[in-house]
Amino acid sequence: MAKTYADLLQETKGQIKQVSLEDLNTRIQAGEKITLVDVREKDEWRQGYIPDAVHLPRGFLEMQAGSKLPDKNAKLVVYCAGGVRSAFAAKALQDLGYTDVESANPGYGQWKDKGFPITSPFAFTDEQLDRYSRHLLLPEVGEKGQQKL
């Protein structure tokens, strides 16, 4: 019999380590060396993220993990909005050979609601994104270059 989504999620969560948001915040505040990996999409990232997190959207994880996360023995904590994508991402990273991976549960939404530290990148308005769309596509300019202008 084929697995359901719920079966797959339960199986995945049984194969990974999970960390509560309170424990994660305590560890970060204590100065533990942790690489945070935010697997949310770009539009979610623009709304804010945990300071110093590496942005690696779930859809690009397997493709870009090697370049964005070169140390396979680093302590990684993966998070998303609610704890589902991060669970699947943590399992994928384990399958790719990363040795110390945890999934934050539940996720960024609760992290923010609890008042834990967040940061927000500069964000273009929809009007600016439309107006400067050609500039943003140019690798020589991109979002960072356009922000300077």
Protein language model regions, located:
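Rhodanese-like catalytic fold shared by cysteine-dependent sulfurtransferases
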Residues: 1-35, 42-75, 81-147
